[in-house]
């Protein structure tokens, strides 16, 4: 086996063993593009070798998806197959593990009417709401990993041949996911422990609010009374550990739904719905987005915010140091899984139940009462920079440094 094949094999093994931590007799579901079938086959192989009972692959084809957006009647985007939504719910109910492989060309739907994209996102969000609750409350094991496709690689490395661009992107993915380490599994265990030290400190301090300051950003975010910081490894309902994102460099919690005030500016392009949104600013009053400006993709961003009532509010606050390995690579991935781990970020839309103390056991009404935002969407956008300072504000109004010049201050 050559060096690349070995790395690809190791990466697939990590997705199965560290990502979702497949258990004997478990169902496994893989969502992936036909563009990265060789990698997906390795995932399937390792899942069965770990004892999976049945591995199902939901294949997507980017070009087929694009043809639908170009040629299908508008009403096709206002519906989502009930059998597919119910199938996912049933699998989640039975404790399946879900692996999502992201590889799409960030410009796939460039030039497509934003209303078509918004209609589909809304229909899918509504249909998959119950399934996503299993995911967002960590009832089941799930992970998101990246795989290099020609379309994505060309965007990240323009001017290179297709073969070279794909090779370069794979190498960056391997670096970011610790595949190149002597013992990748142990490297992930060590990384998990390091992130949990930050989580423990923030949970101990239990700040009432955060204040962000940087060029184009002056934002105060109140945190719910029962907020909990999380990061790296998670534990599902059955007590099994898993790693929801590979890579991951973040520690995160949720904001008080109505407690966000001020202005925040993006620092990296946002890839959303097959389009790129760049250089945007959001203004908040009492938690709600009241003004949107973007140099590129403003219509797409506005459609996102108009998805439902909850998409006018934030659902996640995540801290990532400017000197994180992905940030230091100085590569813009045009993919949220990677770019969010190079930068502090926020998320428009739904919050995670596990970010509230006892949240996994709470009803929807109880969670809302505690300040959790509900939405059919959840979209991260990047706001971190090397000049960003963040203060933690205690219940009695004392300020303590969390970030200085883009990096941890404790």
Swiss-Prot record:
Q: Does the keyword Hydrolase apply?
A: yes
- Cite the cofactor comment: Binds 2 divalent metal cations per subunit. Can use cobalt, zinc, and possibly also magnesium ions.
InterPro entries hit by this protein: M29_Exopeptidase (IPR052170), M29_N-terminal (IPR035097), Peptidase_M29 (IPR000787)
Q: Which residues bind a divalent metal cation 1?
A: 250, 316, 340, 345
Task: Report any one BP term from Gene Ontology.
Answer: proteolysis
| Pfam families registered for this protein in UniProt | Peptidase_M29
Q: Where is the signal peptide?
A: none
Instruction: Return the broad EC class.
Output: hydrolase
- Function summary: Metal-dependent exopeptidase.
Member of which family? Belongs to the peptidase M29 family.
Q: What is this protein called?
A: Aminopeptidase AmpS
Species for this entry: Bacillus subtilis (strain 168)
């Amino acid at each position: 086996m050559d060096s690349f094949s070995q790395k690809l094999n190791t990466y697939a093994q990590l997705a199965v063993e560290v990502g979702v931590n497949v258990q004997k007799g478990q169902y496994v579901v893989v969502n992936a593009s036909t563009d990265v079938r060789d990698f997906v086959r390795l995932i399937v192989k390792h899942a069965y070798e770990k004892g999976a009972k049945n591995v199902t692959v939901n294949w997507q084809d980017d070009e087929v998806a694009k043809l639908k957006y170009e040629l299908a009647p508008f009403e096709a985007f206002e519906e989502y197959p009930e059998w597919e939504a119910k199938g996912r719910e049933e699998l989640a109910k039975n404790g399946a593990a879900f692996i999502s492989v992201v590889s799409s060309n960030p410009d796939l739907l460039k030039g497509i009417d934003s209303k078509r994209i918004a209609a589909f996102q809304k229909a899918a969000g509504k249909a998959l709401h119950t399934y996503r609750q299993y995911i967002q409350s960590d009832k089941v094991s799930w992970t998101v990993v990246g795989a290099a496709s020609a379309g994505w690689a060309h965007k990240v490395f323009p001017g290179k041949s297709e073969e070279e661009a794909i090779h370069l992107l794979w190498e960056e993915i391997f670096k970011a996911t610790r595949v190149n380490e002597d013992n990748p599994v142990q490297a992930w265990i060590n990384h998990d422990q390091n992130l949990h030290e930050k989580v423990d400190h923030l949970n101990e301090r239990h700040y009432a609010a955060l204040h962000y300051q940087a060029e184009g950003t002056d934002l105060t975010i109140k945190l719910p009374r029962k907020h909990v910081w999380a990061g790296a490894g998670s534990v599902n309902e059955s007590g099994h550990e898993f790693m929801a994102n590979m890579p991951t460099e973040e520690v995160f919690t949720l904001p008080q739904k109505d407690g966000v005030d001020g202005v925040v500016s993006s620092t990296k392009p946002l890839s959303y719905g097959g389009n790129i949104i760049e250089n945007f600013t959001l203004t908040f009053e009492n938690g709600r987005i009241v003004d949107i400006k973007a140099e590129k993709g403003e219509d797409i961003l506005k459609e996102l915010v108009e998805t439902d009532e909850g998409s006018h509010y934030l659902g996640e606050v995540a801290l990532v140091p400017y000197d994180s390995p992905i940030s230091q690579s100085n590569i813009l991935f045009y993919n949220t899984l990677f770019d969010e781990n190079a930068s502090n970020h926020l998320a428009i839309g739904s919050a995670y139940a596990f970010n509230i103390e006892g949240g996994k056991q709470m009803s929807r009404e109880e969670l809302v009462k505690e300040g959790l935002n509900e939405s059919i969407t959840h979209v991260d956008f990047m706001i971190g920079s090397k000049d960003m300072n963040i203060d933690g504000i205690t219940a009695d109004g004392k300020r303590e440094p969390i970030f200085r010049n883009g990096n941890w201050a404790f």
